[in-house]
């Protein structure tokens, strides 16, 4: 798909589902930067243990907590991580440039204090105000249980995958 005047971000799965194709994040990042667009990377399959998308040019990283991070599929959740590197002051991003009447005419891309990235700050505050969006305590607890074993699970997954690769070689 081509980048055009309506494009507002580039989105890529680091490891695609279901074919498990691996994206060239550095190349996709170069395209995003050339067009002045944020790169959003879904790193669910790689987990932060195996891949750090910000080191490859990602601006925003998303994960399904239900799969690898939680480790057991019993709790629903997701996470969005903003690297704080993208400049949201381009006129294409009107939600961040124009005054937001519902927040005392705050311009998200300009008026936030240092250390408050515009994208994630707006993403956290607006749904929280409008919907009360937050993860349930039970789901949070179950996901934390899975996070405790993430390093061990990833090491075992990698060791098992290497054994399969040698066998199939």
PLM features: residue spans?
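Conserved PLP-enzyme active-site core in the AAT-like
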Residues: 1-169
């Amino acid at each position: 798909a081509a980048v055009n005047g309506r494009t507002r971000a580039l989105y890529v799965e680091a490891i695609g589902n279901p074919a498990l194709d691996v994206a060239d994040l550095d190349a996709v990042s170069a395209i995003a930067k050339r067009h002045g667009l944020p790169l959003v990377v879904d790193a669910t399959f790689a987990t932060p243990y195996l891949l750090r998308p910000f080191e490859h040019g990602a601006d925003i990283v998303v994960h399904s907590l239900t799969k690898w991070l939680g480790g057991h599929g019993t709790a629903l959740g997701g996470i969005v991580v903003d690297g704080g590197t993208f400049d949201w002051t381009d006129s294409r991003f009107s939600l961040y440039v124009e005054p937001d009447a519902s927040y005392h005419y705050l311009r998200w891309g300009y008026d936030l204090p240092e250390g408050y990235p515009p994208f994630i700050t707006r993403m956290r505050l607006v749904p929280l105000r409008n919907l009360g969006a937050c993860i349930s305590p039970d789901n949070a607890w179950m996901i934390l249980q899975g996070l405790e074993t993430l390093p061990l699970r990833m090491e075992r997954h990698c060791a098992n995958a290497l054994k399969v690769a040698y066998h199939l070689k």
